[in-house]
């Protein structure tokens, strides 16, 4: 009991999976997702300020009008207030827009990737290729990843999220994901990593990730792609570099 209490107080339990009634983001594991969280929190501050100001104005005007309906009957222009309600929203939009564009372009940058993983969406599973590595047969390391049926789930496994094979990657390594599809449009999305990129047939899209901690991160296809769209989970295991090399030798 004391050990459980100690762990709850002093150990940080990170949320890397969807949880019931959760109204916020999953915990970030990459700089991109940290930037998204910071941008969201900053924008929410300005939205709350605007909400408070508009609510106060609405309440004040309604109360004043109810007391004296003809108080401003002969006022046709209010140059000062017109200048304020034109400039103030423009300034707010600029304050929001600049960080948004900076983050948008930073997320699109692929900085000297140490390894490339190709993710191919198919109805209704994912196929992965480690293009930089060749096995003993002289072929690139590749495998398919299917959702584990509900009746085969073991204790601790997640419904519609766990897969029979995982994408294993090393931490603190610049990784490039090249995403495409072989049939219809899919979407490769992992919330904790700040990744969401379309997988379109005949088109290669790329996104980078620098995973900063070990863990298991889940995602799903985020583009309606057919009857089994919900059965296209993504499971990424971030491990230490020695553990990754050991896994690679087994392939």
Curated annotation (Swiss-Prot):
What's noted about post-translational modification? The signal sequence of COX2 is processed by IMP1.
GO biological process per UniProt:
ATP synthesis coupled electron transport
Q: Which CDD domains match?
A: CcO_II_C (cd13912)
Tell me the cofactors it needs: Cu cation
Topological domain (Mitochondrial intermembrane) residues are 16-41, 104-251
Where is it localised? Mitochondrion inner membrane
Q: Which Gene3D superfamilies match?
A: 1.10.287.90, Cupredoxins - blue copper proteins
Q: Hey, which stretches end up on the Mitochondrial matrix side? A: 63-82
Q: What GO annotations for molecular function exist for this entry? A: copper ion binding; cytochrome-c oxidase activity
UniProt record similarity statement: Belongs to the cytochrome c oxidase subunit 2 family.
In UniProt terms, what function does this protein have?
Answer: Component of the cytochrome c oxidase, the last enzyme in the mitochondrial electron transport chain which drives oxidative phosphorylation. The respiratory chain contains 3 multisubunit complexes succinate dehydrogenase (complex II, CII), ubiquinol-cytochrome c oxidoreductase (cytochrome b-c1 complex, complex III, CIII) and cytochrome c oxidase (complex IV, CIV), that cooperate to transfer electrons derived from NADH and succinate to molecular oxygen, creating an electrochemical gradient over the inner membrane that drives transmembrane transport and the ATP synthase.
State the protein's name: Cytochrome c oxidase subunit 2
Q: Which organism is it from?
A: Lachancea thermotolerans (strain ATCC 56472 / CBS 6340 / NRRL Y-8284)
